[in-house]
Amino acid sequence: RWWLGTPLDAREPWRAGSTLADLAGVVDEGTRARLALTRGPRAAIQATRPAPPARMPDTVRVATANLLNYYNGDGRGGGFPTERGAADAAALQRQHDKLVAMLAGLDADVLALMELENDGNGADSALATLLDALNAVPASAGAWRAIDTGPLPYGSDGIRVAMAYRVDRVMPQGAPAWPEAGESAALNRRPLAQAFVPRDGGEPLV
């Protein structure tokens, strides 16, 4: 880390594509291809963040996000370490804050979420915790709702997929759909589908 000039910081991360200029060293003979520096770089050049795509009129913005094993413990501040997610409440808070900022920044109408704790849709569930935080973002105006898959775990794996939508922009059309239990039910992450229609009119989408 020393050649970057300042320690790595989650609030100011180095983007993929960043470069080091005028670097010299010897490649380690081991399997990790580690570089032993003989001369530090002249400069570290941060990659430019690309501009987000412009929101087009009469369109619905659908975004997908891998939540990287988002587990919220027991939903009341305890229940750590979790099966696959955060080791303690502090680790969850770091993960939670980053995810909420990222999801809010997408300005989506529909969110398709992956690697979410499979603990139902109740008030203490991981999905409820995440949507409560999104609804607290001023720009969201409390508009986020989850597609209801019932109170029980969805599929038999420890993590699941889920969908959420903004009620001020789209409406679910019909009931959600998923495969019936069968050979694919063991240890799976059951797929989920839902049709939506824009609030201001337009063609439905699935």
Please name every model-derived segment.
Residues 3, 7-9, 13-19, 31-206:
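Divalent cation-coordinating acidic motifs and surrounding scaffolds
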Residues 20-28:
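OB-fold and OB-like beta-barrel modules that bind single-stranded nucleic acids
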